[in-house]
Amino acid sequence: MINSEISSRLSAPSITPLPAPGGSITDISAHGAWFAEYAAYERSLCERDPSPMSLKLRHTELVTGAARGITESEDIPPPMARACLLAAQYHDLGRFEQYRLFGTFRDRDSVNHAELSAFLIEKYGLLTKEAYVARAVLGAVRLHNVYRLPEDLPSDVRVAARLVRDADKLDILRVMDEELSGSGDCPRTVVLNQPDDPSRFSQKVIGCALRGEVASYDDLTSVNDFRLLLGTWIYGMNFDASRKRFAGDGHAKRLVAALPENGPYAEARARVLQSIAEAG
């Protein structure tokens, strides 16, 4: 939940109201325009380096695109597809306030960005004219960052949450590949302030990889742990289309292949690379 102290520090943007839905049921362009205007407003208020906000705006655009690709490949019915697309559009709405107020994207050092995103959706009435999909959208947004989904979710929430979690991870892989495989220095916020220290490794992250399980952010101790964790996401993809794109994009393969071939990561590295290849 978002406490009163954080709530009192949130901005109060004056943004063009959303029109009533019209046209194709999977056309959410009005929501995309609202989101872009909101992001620009938050950027104008930011007294820190605003470039991480730009990364999040681009991330949102690509997650929404990935979600659309999955809904089409998996033949998700149009009403459910709209819920998935809106959840993708707004899943990181809280990231802008999170960064502006706390200077980090690390939830444990600031605020749960998924809860903040859902809070802002309701605060700004973004689903007032979308009542038939509101439960699925809000549920998926709140749950998109949890380690494991609860078992007893309503079916609409479960479908939207699973799909958005896949789409989110697919684009996070792109971001991490661009930052860690590039020639420049990677911003510390992108790697959740983990040290780039080759001598540090997490046996818990390695163990998850060897067991074919998704590793937890809570167990990270270094950038190399982060690389391996990203590779373990192959074990948590929920849709065939997601798994194929995970392998086909090449981002995860590059990230994991950059781990040392010898030493503590060797066996886990080989296991994850094999799993990625088999998904392609």
Model segments located where?
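Short, low-complexity S/T/E/D/G/P-rich linear segments that nucleate or cap local secondary structure
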Residues: I2-R9
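Divalent metal-dependent phosphate-bond-processing catalytic cores, especially two-metal-ion Mg2+/Mn2+ enzymes
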Residues: L10, I15-S29, P52-E61, G65, ...
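An amphipathic alpha-helix signature
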Residues: G32-A39, T64, A118, E122, ...
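Active-site flanking loop/helix segments enriched in acidic
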Residues: A36-L62, F96-D107
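Short gly/ser-rich anion-binding loops that grip negatively charged ligand groups
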Residues: M53, G103-V111, Y124-L127, A131
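An active-site-proximal "capping" alpha-helix that borders the catalytic cofactor pocket
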Residues: L62-I70, V111-G125
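Acidic/histidine metal-binding catalytic segments
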Residues: D75-L86, L126-L143, D156-L163
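His-Asp-centered metal-binding catalytic motifs of divalent-metal-dependent phosphohydrolases/nucleases
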Residues: A81-R106, S117, A136-Y147
